[in-house]
Amino acid sequence: MYPLLDRIEIPAQLRTLKRNQLPQLADELRNFLVESVAGTGGHLSSNLGTVELTIALHYVFDTPFDRLIWDVGHQTYAHKILTGRRTGMARLRMQGGIAGFPRRDESEYDAFGTAHSSTSISAALGMAVAARLKGVKQHAIAVIGDGAMSAGMAFEALNNAGVMDANLLVILNDNDMSISPPVGALNNYLAKLMSGRFYATARRAGEKMLGVVPPVLELAKRAEEHVKGMVTPSTLFEEFGFNYIGPIDGHDLDILLTTLNNIKQLDGPQFLHVVTRKGKGYKQAEEDPILYHGVGKFQPDQGIVSKPSAKLAYTQIFGDWLCDMAAKDSRLIGITPAMREGSGLVRFSKEYPDRYFDVGIAEQHAVTFAAGAACEGLKPVVAIYSTFLQRAYDQLIHDVAIQNLPVVFAIDRAGLVGADGPTHAGSFDLSYLRCIPNITVMTPADENECRQMLYTAFQLDTPAAVRYPRGSGPGVQIQQEMQTIPLGKGEIRRQGKQIALLAFGSMLTPCLEAGDELDATVVNMRFVKPLDQELVATLAAEHELLVTIEENTIMGGAGSAVMESLSSLDKNVRLLQLGLPDSFIDQGDPAHMLSDCGLDKAGIIQSIKERFSL
């Protein structure tokens, strides 16, 4: 079924193939990708778009000696298949299986771990400089998408790399434009010319010679820019100190191989612009690459078949609230750093296009942009994943909290996220938020509470964060009428004896189950900041043991807030803190992951019985 692919376990075997065999290999690899991802779920569109580029890179460069770094990393399935992990694709993103992103501890071919965007150029530059200092003739290659290139970190790295004169190759994987046949053919020819040794040598010699005659040098430079500017996007990357080549067709193996072989002979920073098509080779993914960006299991001959869910996802609850709130208050604006679909802003973007702002992969900018808007009387709502808010921590403190501005942070993917693993888990937000002055931090336990907490946050004139998990809640009916929740007040959901379970957010459901068996008091704490200290004091006076349960790291989290509150009381009460351990938790089924952390009914009961004789 896969005659060429079956012969390849490592790139060294790939390099034994003849060039005219590589198009067939690309077809086989693409077919295998569709079949494999259909059986496991995962990222599809981006991987189908990088098949030829992946083959060409491993064919031309001596990996793993030459360092190959994939930005974001969700487009690395072909890379994993060609580097000894084809059989592992059957357990892609599953517990004990291979990761959906590059991991250094998984393969020597994964030179750098990635999952968040725009880090590849910085990492590759560090490796290139290290090779130079060690006197090693080694190539460092960063493959970065056009979306990731919009982030400030990518341009910081380009700015630094241009003056380092290291052997760095940056490949821009541009899948947001198309090449018309005549322009494409001319660009392909010019790419061969500009990546050749003769052109590079002549260019450097000309710069040295004309450098002694500044007016002539400037005239020559402008002439070169004028000619190249007619057929290439711009000379922006030349201004950073790179030799710019392209754009070229990223699905034409002949031009890819020729260009990469030429670049391999050059010294200094090189920039190759390739144009690819997301979903290439699979009709459904080509027609709707966003739908097929991240997929569950499906039948390849049918494609994705939408199935209505019995429960609303928290993401949809947020999106519906945002539209309802926007209808009531014209000051509301919605901001997302390139996560319209993932954060639930599709409907809002269509109904309120003038109040919707997708700022690109620019989390730092998103937060300060919101702060500026808040200064002028608007009410910004920043929809962001917990793991990505980490990237804007200084802006959160310096630009929002210190100025006490009314910005609402709708924090999705709080806690464990399943198949995406530790790079995308929201394990730390309670810890890194609660230590910031002026901010209110809320943790809804169900669907209706999420809606009402978002409304409560919006009514405040100070910064506020509502953090909610991936997926759906326990199935509580949503009250359409919006009401504020008393600030900093928890609620007792079950009255028991001896033991009090203080649940934060998603942990209320397993705590209620455990509480029934233990005959324990169960409290929905609701707020991490301000903490309901009066309730904590009452619970401490009436119980022998308090147990805090949170889907956040134990260190510095909600349990720590309770412990700090207890330290000011003259009460002889024991405290047990349950939460995520001081380690990065690998991918898996969310329910199994929580069970492994002791955050289900059985785990909570077992932890209490192991620690205390009750």
From Swiss-Prot:
This is 1-deoxy-D-xylulose-5-phosphate synthase. CDD domains: TPP_DXS (cd02007), TPP_PYR_DXS_TK_like (cd07033). It comes from Nitrosomonas europaea (strain ATCC 19718 / CIP 103999 / KCTC 2705 / NBRC 14298). GO terms for cellular component: cytosol. HAMAP family: DXP_synth (MF_00315). Homodimer. Keywords: Isoprene biosynthesis, Magnesium, Metal-binding, Thiamine biosynthesis, Thiamine pyrophosphate, Transferase. Belongs to the transketolase family. DXPS subfamily. The gene is dxs. GO terms for biological process: 1-deoxy-D-xylulose 5-phosphate biosynthetic process; isopentenyl diphosphate biosynthetic process, methylerythritol 4-phosphate pathway; terpenoid biosynthetic process; thiamine biosynthetic process. GO terms for molecular function: 1-deoxy-D-xylulose-5-phosphate synthase activity; magnesium ion binding; thiamine pyrophosphate binding. It holds the Pfam family DXP_synthase_N. Binds 1 Mg(2+) ion per subunit. Binds 1 thiamine pyrophosphate per subunit.
